[in-house]
Amino acid sequence: MDVICDTSFLMVFVSTPIGQIDKIEAYFGKLNFLIPDVVISELKDLEHKTGPKRSRMVKTAIEMSFSKFKVVNVLKSRHVDEAIIDYAITHKCAVATIDRDLRRRLMLNNLVILTLSKNKLIIASQSKT
């Protein structure tokens, strides 16, 4: 299953060991994490606007995006969240996020949502189709 990641999820992913991925994969199949190009742009902006510790985390997230995940081009939108939602709907993929507002909007669109709880990957919402 393809899973498109937002900035919040990616930042936590690089800073915290995450468990339960194998259980999610047993349910959905192999997870292919996708990073939208707009998230990379957002990370690059963050890298220059934060302190040294957070800047190193952002740099690690950018490097990991290119080495371990697939970076995908998404339709440009005024807001990164809109681009992620549009991509998820068009390509029928799940979304990994920590962002409450984005999760709410994804639920309204009946999309599969993966999030973190106590350093474990969980299914926050499942498509009803």
Question: Which residues does each PLM region occupy?
Answer:
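Nuclease catalytic cores that cleave nucleic-acid phosphodiester bonds
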Residues: 39-129
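Domain-level signal for Mg2+-assisted phosphodiester chemistry and nucleotide/NA-binding surfaces
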Residues: 1-68
